[in-house]
Amino acid sequence: MSAGEPGNEPTAEPTDEFTDESADHHAHTLEQFPEKLAVVRLGPGAEVPAWAESSSLFSVTATATETSVVCAMRSVPRKAKQAGPLIAFAVQGVLDFALTGVLSDLLRPLAAARISVFTVSTFDTDWVLVPVNDAERAAEEWRRSGHEVVIAVPVKP
């Protein structure tokens, strides 16, 4: 058959599909913070409570249906709706907004190890929070995947 005959059309290479998992993989350095954190659910439009503070990560996210606060577990009232304790890992350095696949690179090994995560992104970097009981296992999974994990020196935000 010649190239022009039916059944012998050239096949197009996929252009929008990610076919090689290692092609865009980048090794990252993660800083592991020692402070135990909590994610607290407040009502929509809630003010940030005076008790909400942290020495590593403090984040407020508000939507029409809720306000979530990430803060030090030690300061959260027992009656508050919360998840934790969690340990935070921050991607070291400032990430360019054009960089793709950072969270994918970091979450893939944790998903394979069945480690649950809560992620937060700031203007500069990404944070991955894991249950305190899974923190060392998460660090080991990252190391096995080519990432580096170092102990962070907390600086109060």
Where would I find each of the regions flagged by the language model?
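A cross-kingdom feature marking solvent-exposed beta-strand/loop segments within repeated
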Residues: A112-V128, D134, V155-P157
